A protein has these predicted regions:
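Conserved redox-active cysteine motifs that mediate thiol-disulfide chemistry
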Residues: 1-11
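Structural alpha/beta surface segment adjacent to cysteine/selenocysteine redox centers
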Residues: 10-97
Length: 97
């Protein structure tokens, strides 16, 4: 998930509750990095962690799990997250939010 999307999720939830009932919100997914099994490079990992810190400085209530980087070997693919959202949507459309 985009770190800015994560940071602004509480605001987005407030916006959703204030929208007219007859307005339909559709979520569209797009992978930013090609689907592959390659581990994320150290440079990319640092770039993303630095971005997380920048987001936290800008939106202080935002929290990220930095243990993720120590406990996992992330892949350089955004399609994995997209497939997870699609799977959640198939189970229940409310889950994709």
């Amino acid at each position: 998930m985009c770190s800015w999307c994560w940071a602004f999720k509480p605001i987005w939830q407030k916006i959703l509750t204030s929208l007219p009932q007859n307005l339909t919100v559709e979520y569209l997914l797009g992978g930013l990095a090609p689907d592959n099994d390659n581990p994320m490079s150290p440079e990319t990992r640092k770039f993303i962690m630095d971005n997380w810190r920048r987001v936290q400085d800008t939106v202080p209530a935002t929290e990220f799990n930095y243990e993720f980087w120590r406990l996992n070997t992330p892949k350089r693919s955004t399609f994995i997250a997209c497939r997870a959202v699609i799977s959640a949507r198939i189970q229940n459309p409310k889950f994709e939010r």
